[in-house]
Amino acid sequence: GSNVKGGHVSIEQAKIYAEWLAARYHDKPNIVWLNGGDIHGSDTVDVWNAIGYTFMQKDSGHLVTFHPRGRTQSSWWYHEKPWLDFNMFQSGHRNYDQDDTELSYGEDNWRYAETDYDLVPVKPTLDGEPSYEHIPQGLHDTLQPYWNDNDVRRYAYWSVFAGSCGFTYGHNSVMQFYRPGDRKGSFGVRKFWFDGIHDPGAGQMKHLKKLMLSCPYFERIPDQSLIANQGK
């Protein structure tokens, strides 16, 4: 989203690019369009709307959402837009002490899901960028502890039980495909991607999926009252 925010993409250019993408991939079965790009939806609203409406008109067979900045959610800006098929929030990579936003949800990603679930019109929601496995807490300070499989499991179950339609798993090494010979990786990467894919968090996501699909998917209703002492 930085190119758009920097004023390097006009509304007309955005439409042309979205039309090209839609034409190229409209017959592919595994496409979900992520409008935005790790950015506040309040930045260059007209461009994001142009892209969203173009996808809706030119490729109605694929879902469209918006990838927001850390500790924000797409519903703040686009929930009522017809091009937004489902909401996405980014709980981000900060721990409780590092979150300096007004909401101060910190690691409580379930709060974003709970908020979206109660909106009208009803739309699905999920955490599109929670803390990734094996990435430093807060991203940039490599002296901080690294998020592990216990953390990603916690985020996954918390958000799904609060009403999310699914979950996004990420791994620091795999995200950047870090490999031998790369001069310098990002975010304190310590593993190669082909080792990272075998870390425990990735393999454990299947258990949540199995649980979600063990009952009729569209009949799931979150009930936070079942949780005693917030899981402590």
Task: Kindly give the residue locations of the regions a language model identified.
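Active-site clefts of carbohydrate-active enzymes
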Residues: 75, 84-103, 107-150
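Structural recognition of the beta-strand scaffold that forms the well-ordered cores
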Residues: 31-35, 63-66, 85-89, 124-132, ...
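Aromatic- and carboxylate-lined catalytic core of secreted/periplasmic carbohydrate-active enzymes
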Residues: 121-125, 133-136, 152-232
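Active-site mouth of glycoside hydrolases
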Residues: 1-98, 108
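Residue-level preference for long, well-ordered alpha-helices that form the structural scaffold
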Residues: 6, 10, 14, 44, ...
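Short Asp/Glu-rich motifs
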Residues: 3, 76, 137, 178-179
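Short amphipathic alpha-helical segments and helix-helix/interface helices
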Residues: 22, 52, 113-117, 156
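A structural motif corresponding to the C-terminal end of an alpha-helix
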Residues: 24-29, 57-59, 115-123, 162-164
